[in-house]
Amino acid sequence: MRKLLLLALFTAVPAAAQTPAVEAARAAGIIGERYDGYLGVASAVSGAVRSQVATINIQRRSLYSNLAARKGVSPQDVGITAGCQLLARVAVGQAYMWADGAWRRRAAGQAAPVPDYCR
């Protein structure tokens, strides 16, 4: 079921348009991926970037809800499944939120942060 959700999730919609400000904040570790499939704010950020993060999360929530309705699962399940894939893509220096709610940064030489439940 997880593989079907992932396939549907990542083929159903093109990658969300990321603005240069969002990409710069992500690269700086100011914003990052959360375990639940949403983008989060790890430290102080401008109102414009915070607004763009909220817009991205609204788009993700809509996608997760639509996919969940089609697959007969909860939007939270779809988000967690997406979170597994998004965390696997976190680059060195980028921030990410683990399931315990703590923000971390991926260090050089560190494996991609993938929770055990994703495997």
Regions found by a protein language model. Give the residues of each.
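Amphipathic, charged alpha-helical segments and their helix-to-coil junctions
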Residues: 18-33, 40-44, 48-51, 79-119
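N-terminal signal peptide c-region/cleavage motif recognized by signal peptidases
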Residues: 12-14
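Surface-exposed patches in mature extracellular/periplasmic domains of secreted proteins
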Residues: 52, 64-82
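A periodicity- and composition-biased signal for non-globular, repetitive helical segments
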Residues: 8-9, 66
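Short, surface-exposed polybasic-aromatic patches that bind anionic ligands, especially phosphate groups
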Residues: 27-28, 36, 65, 69
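Sec-dependent signal peptide recognition
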Residues: 1-7
